[in-house]
Amino acid sequence: MPQNTLNTVILAAGKGTRMYSQMPKVLHCIGGKPMVERVIDTAAALNPQNICVVVGHGKEQVLDTVKRDAVWVEQTEQLGTGHAVKTALPHLASEGRTLVLYGDVPLIDVETLETLLEAAGNEVGLLTDVPADPAGLGRIIRDGSGSVTAIVEEKDASATQKTIREINTGILVLPNAKLENWLNSLSSNNAQGEYYLTDLIAKAVADGIKVRPVRVRASHLAAGVNNKRQLAELERIFQTEQAQELLKAGVTLRDPARFDLRGRLKHGQDVVIDVNVVIEGEVELGDNVEIGANCVIKNAKIGANSKIAPFSHLEGCEVGENNRIGPYARLRPQARLADDVHVGNFVEIKNAAIGKGTKANHLTYIGDAEVGSKTNFGAGTIIANYDGVHKHKTVIGDEVRIGSNCVLVAPVTLGNKVTTGAGSAITRNIEDNKLALARARQTVIEGWVRPEKNKQ
């Protein structure tokens, strides 16, 4: 096996007590993706021989949530980071190198890890930082020549050592040929009664192996999450970076600080996104698309020159070109809109194909339907697609005019150029060019006197 073989171990067994959550800490999300999933994806970009994830608390939840190709190893007792890596030993190559990462350090990037791996060579690589406040973190101990000799955890540090500002991020590169012996020789004789992975630095020095420190270029890249405040801080950093990338690519963000991207956005030119918009999953926006304030767009494709008015929610749908959607519109999964469609306020469309030029401007539900072109839905139109057990399909032709406050009871078919009178309940098929009325005749009662309250 070549000496440059890379194994990756991701430690994700911690409970996360300070998160005050029933969810395992590593499943809390940054940018809509669980932290541990982000770390796995970053590790995978390095093309390692394998990725080994050490889990413990909430193991079942983690395995059910994160669908990634990895070796999953359970740490039944949380006895420290050294013990966690030892748990993964049977899955690591006897030669090459092992990169140790953490499931709660979500913003570590490929560039930083490649720099660390290059610096480490076949020796030990150590990622360090000099944060504004090093409290609670392990300190880097150097000798008179500046070489790293040890890492001391804060609980075990002397008063002098606590004045050191350079800290250990926990991310290490270790030679596999030495790793097993080093791990087996670890002691838990320390303030926390745990097996510290950081003690391997002193063992490397004792064996004459050079420790190559690399300082991270930005503290947030190696920052861990221990509570909701830190989670929110990293989320905002992540979102700021996402917004800056979109701005560089030509997207207009009315306020970059009030925009969230929780997935991937593919976009054309001259796209404009107003404030408080959330993009989730896989979203594609064509040229000249405008997204109004307070919209949520999830797993959707929106064609060129379409405008999404404020407070609209689009999920799992496809919108053609030159559409006008909203305000307060909802497009649900499998809504498929052709070009030049208008969907107005308080209109909901689900699992329906809408033809070119069709309009539903207000207060309408269209579900499980196939609608032709240039059809108009009057206000208050409802497609009653559910009989309490099964969903049924409605077919509506071209240039149909549906009067206000109509109910179309599925399964039902309306031919081309059909007109329905306002207030009709349509339960039977209607042929082309027909007018259908299905409502009670109006009755006017002569001489009727409205009751009045007794004023006494």
From Swiss-Prot:
Q: Broadest EC class?
A: transferase
Enumerate the residues binding Mg(2+).
D104, N226
Q: Which GO terms describe its molecular function?
A: glucosamine-1-phosphate N-acetyltransferase activity; magnesium ion binding; UDP-N-acetylglucosamine diphosphorylase activity
Q: What cellular component terms from Gene Ontology apply here?
A: cytoplasm; membrane
Q: Does the keyword Cytoplasm apply?
A: yes
| Catalytic activity entry | alpha-D-glucosamine 1-phosphate + acetyl-CoA = N-acetyl-alpha-D-glucosamine 1-phosphate + CoA + H(+); N-acetyl-alpha-D-glucosamine 1-phosphate + UTP + H(+) = UDP-N-acetyl-alpha-D-glucosamine + diphosphate
Metabolic or biological pathway: Nucleotide-sugar biosynthesis; UDP-N-acetyl-alpha-D-glucosamine biosynthesis; N-acetyl-alpha-D-glucosamine 1-phosphate from alpha-D-glucosamine 6-phosphate (route II): step 2/2; Nucleotide-sugar biosynthesis; UDP-N-acetyl-alpha-D-glucosamine biosynthesis; UDP-N-acetyl-alpha-D-glucosamine from N-acetyl-alpha-D-glucosamine 1-phosphate: step 1/1; Bacterial outer membrane biogenesis; LPS lipid A biosynthesis
Annotated active site: H362 (proton acceptor)
EC numbers: 2.7.7.23, 2.3.1.157
Where in or outside the cell?
Cytoplasm
Q: Which residues form the signal peptide?
A: none
Quaternary structure, per UniProt, is: Homotrimer.
* Classification via PANTHER family: BIFUNCTIONAL PROTEIN GLMU, NUCLEOTIDYL TRANSFERASE
UniProt protein name: Bifunctional protein GlmU
**UniProt organism field:** Neisseria gonorrhoeae
Q: What is the lineage of its organism?
A: Bacteria, Pseudomonadati, Pseudomonadota, Betaproteobacteria, Neisseriales
